[in-house]
Amino acid sequence: MGRVSGKVALITGAAAGLGRADAIALVREGARVCITDVNAAAGETLAAELNRGSAGSAYFIRHDVRDEDQWIGVIAEVKRRFGGLHVLVNNAGVVVMGTPESTTLDQFRLQQSVMSEGVFLGCKHAIPVMRDAGGGSIINMSSIASHLGYPVYFAYSAAKGAVRSMTKAIAVHCQMNKYNIRCNSVHPGAMHTNMVETSAKELGIPISAFEQMPSGLGQPEDVANLVIFLASEESRFVNGAELMIDNALAVQ
């Protein structure tokens, strides 16, 4: 308990899956959180659950990460409510399966806008507020797809690759300017989330097929444990890193 006590965190795509697990873990470890998502019903439900366990620890804002004006409003509301921001988890994502030949331009642009542009906008507008709060930690959710050649996840891989590269540039920028802000990317493998279940259906395979891989199927809580480490002062010298959480899937 208390590994991130006193910190304020903003988590995008937090209504389900990895983001939901991150929010639960951050509140459990003492943070106050703003959770955002386009799914207002699920987001409000999660905020209510978190507040039942720890009053005043969470609130929800409906937020499309593709919209810069919404980013400005969300960051301003976090600062107004909690006085600052110490942890940003850029988690929002979307998958539209397709190969380099079958992917449409609209599908490609959608995934770039949610993940690549969404991460850019989040970092751009969070950095000044985090700097003024004395520093903090930016955690960008990438994927092992940014390292591996998955033809059926073509546009998704491209977007997550952009997140991987941006993370390094942001880390160096903040270090050179002495902002005391760290920026790292997390690269999950196959995790038991709604997104992976949907992918399995589209591939025509049962979710158990992922479980039977040598690396197995991870749980959202596995990623949340890593997020807590990166959000806490335990990782104070970890900056610009790529943290794989895939049970060696990417190195096989």
Model-assigned labels for residue ranges:
Residues 177-182, 238-240:
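Short, small/polar-rich loop/turn modules that mediate ligand/substrate recognition or access, typified
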Residues 212-223:
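A conserved structural motif in NAD(P)-dependent oxidoreductases
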Residues 99-100, 104-109, 138, 196:
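Substrate-binding pocket helix/loop in short-chain dehydrogenase/reductase
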Residues 128, 172-176, 236:
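Alpha-helical segment proximal to the catalytic Tyr-Lys
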Residues 143:
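Residue(s) in the substrate-gating loop at a strand-loop-helix junction
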